[in-house]
Structure formats: structure tokens, C-alpha cells
């Protein structure tokens, strides 16, 4: 290897001596730039990279200022990017400051709670791991609660004691939660939402019981103390009963409208009142019945009764009989002494007696049937209806068959509804829903004249307006017809006068032309100036008449010229 390097340097030295000055300068520059590039690459690769303090951007400006102040107190150099991220130069220093900030809870809210365990240090202890676990669980629960629509902010504090050797000595896990309700939320008074929040916290933390959870609002009121919500529950129950009552009444009102609209027009009846009485109490009934035991069922093919029943079935029986017959004996006292038997019994001592006893015990089984019925908590116990029905309004006519006008309106007569029709309406209403008179249901239908004055006035105003418009159209049509007739007559007379004038002018022109021809034929000397001037004047007048006729009726003039050309041809 040493020989190789020796030969390499010898050959390089020989080549360098043989090279020209320009080549030597170029080679030196190349070597210089290569060395400079190597130095730059080595310096760049050994330079420490910026380490992000947290993997997420810090959007809260107040939190960002607190973190910056804490880093300044530790005399740490850091770089703040435009997106709210903090970068440090040393990775070890970043881990140290991250642990300090986590301990002082200066961590972004939207940061992953379990990112605390991404901190790798050789010197981390079990105590620090338990603290990190508690903080991660706390932050996870806070993020879970803040995600609810009814919570604006939350603060969770967990007490997780160390595991004891004996179960009896183990302290329970406890949690205190302070929430800030969102404006417009009813989580403070809504028991179901509070219970859901308790379940959410209980299931998120291992070993936590619902009795060890305290949830308060900003004023310090305990929300999960349900003993204070009994009054609110009663109010909610009353509100639900009211809404249910209104729902039943609306349904019944719709059924009545549907039933009455089939026999009456909508404007002829009015539902004055629909009252539904509800019983929301829960009622459970237990009954016990004894029925005969069926020994043989009814034969479906037999026309007579083949069914055999028994009141009971004997399970066991016991019969006992006792009989005794003999002389009764009344004992006396000691010998030589009179006994204590009363005198009335001493006379019966020599009478023979007879005793019979008969006893029969039977154990029977009865056909016993027990039933338990539970009524629905919301049932209708009474319905009362009040309905007004209007009669019929008919117009009043005079002897000529025209409307009778009274006070600027057409006169009307009211015809009340017959009692039979009212009874039919009540029958229709009774069949439209579950009508039960035994539970106190009542339906009242009364015939009352509705106030229709404004309605009639509007109808009559429209009627009179339409009549006036019809009369105006009639007069206008007559006037228009007369105008058309006048214009037609005027146009016909004008045409006739024009036709006569043209005929007269043509006749005069023809006579003048004949006179001129006659004069020319007679020698021409006798033609006077008046005849020539008159002929010129008549020719001009004839030309003007021809032009006027061509303007008024160009088609007739064209036909006349066409005919004249054909004749001359």
C-alpha cells in the first residue's frame, strides 16, 4: 500500500512539473474549491437542527405569551415561527423545557393528551409517569367534554390514589369537574344531560364511581345533586302532560274538521272548544279468578252440550268415624265419703249413653287464574266538545224577480238549521272518534247565526261593481256600434258623392273633347281662347282626379291601365 502511494505521488509530481503555468493555476483552484466544499458540507451536517417544543401550533395568544415568559426566565434561546410554533436549538434542552411546561400545565389545549408519553428520558421516574398518566387522562376527558354542544369550557381535577396492599385500605378515585355552560344551553336544569355527563366521566376513568363525581357550574352549584331537581322534574312532567294534552286536542280537532267538512261547508261551522282529560297516573291491577275445571270439551259436531266441568279436583281425602255406647259413671270420693258430683248429675249416673262422631277431610285443587294488568300512563278519561253551526242565508226577491235592496245591500233571510240535521251532526261526531258516554264524554252542537255583515257587504260591493261594469260595457258597445254605423253611412255617402262627381267630370271632359274635335274638323279658325283654356283646365283637373284615384285605390287604377293597354294593343 505504501508503495502505491509512493508511486502515485511521484507520478503526480512529474505531471505537475510538466504542466504549464495555466494548468497549474487551474489545478490549484480546483483543489481549493473542493476543500472549501468539503468544509461547508461538514459544517452543515454537524450543525444542530431546530427542535419543535410542541408538535402543534399554539393558537391561544395568552398561552403563547405565558410560555414565552417561562422560557425567558430559564434563559432559553428560542425561535417563534409565524404559525405559532416554538423551536429550540438543543434537543436535550427542548425535552427539559417540555417537562417543565407540562408540570406547570402550560400545554396547548388541542394537543394530543397522550403526547406526554412521547418524552423519552433515561431519568424519568415512576412518579413522573403516574403524573403524566393522570394529566393525559385529565386532558382527554376535558377535550371530550368540551366537544359537547352545551359546554363552553371545562376544568377537570382527578384524584388517583396509589394502589394499596389491601382492598379495604384502597382509597377511591375522585373527580371534580367545573363547567361553563354555553349561552342558551339548558344543561343546568336538564337532568338527562347531567346524567349523561356523569356517565361520560365515569366510563372514561377506570375505577371511578358516580358517587365520587362532583360537577359544578361557575357559581358553585352542584349539578349532579339530583335531590334538588325533584321540583324541576315535576315541572318538566307537567309541561310534558300539557304538550300531550294539546297534541290529543289537535288530533281530535282534525278528525272533527274532516268529519264535518263532509256534510257542511267549512265556513258554516266553528269548533268552539275541544277539551281532552288525560289520566297520566300509572295504575296496576292484580286479579284472581276461580273458574270450573273442564273435564270434557264441547264436541263441535254435536248440537247439544257435551261439555263437562267440575268445580274442583280432589287431591287427597281423609275420613274418620267414632262410635261409643255404654253406661256413664260418675266417680265418687274416697270410700265412706260422699263425692263432689252435683246433685243434678247424680241422677244421670245410671243412664246408658251413645256417642257417634264422623269426620271427612278433602284437599281439593281449584282452577285458579291470576292476572296482572297495567294501564297505560297516558289515557283519555273524558272528552267534551262545543260546536257552533250556522244556518242558511237566502236572498229576498221582489215581484219582478229582482233583488230587494236595503241599506245599499241585497236583503237576505236567515233560515236556521233543523233539529234533525243537528242530531245527524251529533251522530257524525260521535262516530268520528271513540265516543264513550260512560266515561263522561259530551258533545254539544248549537245552531247560532254567525255575524256575516262584513262578508255580505264585501260580496255585495263586488256584485254591484260587476253590475256597473257590465252596464258600462253595454253602453260602450251601443256607442261603439252607433259610431261604426255613422262612419259606415258617412263613408258610403262620401263614396257615392265622389263617384257622381267623377262621372260628371268625365262627362264634362268628354263633351269638351268632342267640342275640340268638332272645332278642329270644322277648320280650326273658330277655336277660341276660352275653349283652349277650358280644355287645358279640364285636362289638369282630370289629371289631378286620376292621381287622387291612384292614391286611394291603386289596384283599381292598375287594372284600368292594364285593360286600356290590352285594348290599344
UniProtKB/Swiss-Prot annotation:
GO terms for cellular component: bacterial-type flagellum basal body, MS ring; plasma membrane. Pfam families: YscJ_FliF, YscJ_FliF_C. Keywords: Bacterial flagellum, Cell inner membrane, Cell membrane, Membrane, Transmembrane, Transmembrane helix. It is a multi-pass membrane protein. Residues 281-291 have a biased composition (Basic and acidic residues). InterPro entries: AMP-bd_C_sf, Flag_M-ring_C, FlgMring_FliF, FliF_N_dom, YscJ/FliF. The keyword Protease does not apply. Residues 295-319 have a biased composition (Polar residues). The M ring may be actively involved in energy transduction. This is Flagellar M-ring protein. It comes from Borreliella burgdorferi (strain ATCC 35210 / DSM 4680 / CIP 102532 / B31).
Amino acid at each position: 500500500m505504501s508503495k502505491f502511494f509512493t508511486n502515485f505521488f511521484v507520478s503526480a509530481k512529474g505531471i505537475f512539473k510538466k504542466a504549464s503555468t495555466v494548468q497549474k493555476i487551474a489545478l490549484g483552484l480546483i483543489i481549493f474549491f473542493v476543500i472549501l466544499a468539503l468544509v461547508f458540507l461538514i459544517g452543515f451536517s454537524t450543525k444542530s437542527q431546530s427542535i419543535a417544543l410542541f408538535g402543534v401550533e399554539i393558537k391561544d395568544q395568552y398561552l403563547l405569551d405565558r410560555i414565552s415568559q417561562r422560557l425567558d426566565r430559564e434563559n432559553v434561546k428560542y425561535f417563534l415561527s409565524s404559525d405559532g410554533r416554538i423551536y429550540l436549538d438543543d434537543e436535550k434542552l427542548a425535552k427539559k423545557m417540555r417537562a417543565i411546561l407540562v408540570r406547570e400545565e402550560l400545554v396547548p389545549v388541542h394537543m394530543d393528551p397522550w403526547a406526554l408519553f412521547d418524552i423519552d428520558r433515561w431519568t424519568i421516574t415512576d412518579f413522573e409517569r403516574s403524573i403524566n398518566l393522570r394529566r393525559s387522562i385529565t386532558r382527554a376527558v376535558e377535550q371530550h367534554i368540551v366537544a359537547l354542544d352545551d359546554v363552553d369550557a371545562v376544568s377537570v381535577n382527578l384524584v388517583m390514589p396509589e394502589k394499596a396492599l389491601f382492598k379495604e385500605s384502597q382509597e377511591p378515585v375522585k373527580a371534580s369537574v367545573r363547567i361553563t355552560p354555553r349561552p342558551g344551553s339548558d344543561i343546568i336544569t336538564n337532568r338527562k344531560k347531567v346524567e349523561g355527563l356523569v356517565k361520560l366521566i365515569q366510563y372514561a376513568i377506570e375505577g371511578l364511581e358516580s358517587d365520587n363525581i362532583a360537577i359544578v357550574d361557575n357559581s358553585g352549584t352542584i349539578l349532579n345533586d339530583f335531590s334538588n331537581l325533584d321540583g324541576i322534574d315535576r315541572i318538566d312532567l307537567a309541561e310534558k302532560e300539557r304538550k300531550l294534552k294539546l297534541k290529543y286536542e289537535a288530533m281530535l280537532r282534525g278528525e272533527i274538521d274532516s268529519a264535518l267538512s263532509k256534510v257542511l261547508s267549512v265556513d258554516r261551522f266553528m269548533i268552539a272548544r275541544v277539551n281532552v282529560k288525560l289520566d297520566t297516573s300509572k295504575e296496576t291491577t292484580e286479579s284472581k279468578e276461580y273458574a270450573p275445571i273442564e273435564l270434557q270439551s264441547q264436541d263441535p259436531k254435536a248440537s247439544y252440550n257435551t261439555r263437562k266441568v267440575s268445580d274442583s279436583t280432589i287431591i287427597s281425602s281423609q275420613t274418620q268415624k267414632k262410635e261409643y255406647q255404654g253406661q256413664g259413671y260418675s266417680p265418687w270420693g274416697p270410700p265412706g265419703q260422699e263425692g263432689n258430683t252435683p246433685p243434678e248429675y247424680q241422677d244421670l249416673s245410671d243412664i246408658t249413653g251413645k256417642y257417634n262422631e264422623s269426620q271427612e277431610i278433602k284437599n281439593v285443587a281449584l282452577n285458579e287464574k291470576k292476572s296482572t294488568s297495567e294501564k297505560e300512563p297516558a289515557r283519555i278519561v273524558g272528552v267534551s266538545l262545543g260546536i257552533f253551526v250556522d244556518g242558511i242565508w237566502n236572498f229576498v226577491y221582489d215581484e219582478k224577480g229582482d233583488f230587494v235592496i236595503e241599506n245599499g245591500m241585497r236583503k237576505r233571510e236567515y233560515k236556521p238549521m233543523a233539529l234533525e240535521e243537528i242530531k245527524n251532526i251529533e251522530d257524525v261526531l260521535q262516530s268520528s272518534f271513540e265516543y264513550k258516554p260512560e266515561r263522561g264524554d259530551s258533545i254539544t252542537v248549537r245552531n247560532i247565526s254567525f255575524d256575516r255583515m262584513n262578508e255580505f257587504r264585501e260580496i255585495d260591493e263586488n256584485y254591484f261593481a260587476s253590475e256597473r261594469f257590465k252596464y258600462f260595457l253595454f253602453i260602450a258597445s251601443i256607442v261603439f256600434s252607433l259610431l261604426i254605423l255613422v262612419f259606415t253611412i258617412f263613408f258610403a255617402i262620401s263614396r257615392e258623392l265622389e263617384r257622381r262627381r267623377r262621372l260628371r267630370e268625365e262627362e264634362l271632359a268628354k263633351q269638351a273633347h268632342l267640342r275640340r274635335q268638332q272645332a278642329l274638323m270644322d277648320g280650326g279658325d273658330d277655336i277660341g281662347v276660352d275653349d283652349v283654356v277650358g280644355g287645358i283646365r279640364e285636362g289638369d283637373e282630370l289629371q289631378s282626379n286620376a292621381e287622387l284615384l291612384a292614391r286611394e285605390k291603386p289596384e283599381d287604377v292598375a287594372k284600368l291601365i292594364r285593360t286600356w293597354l290590352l285594348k290599344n294593343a
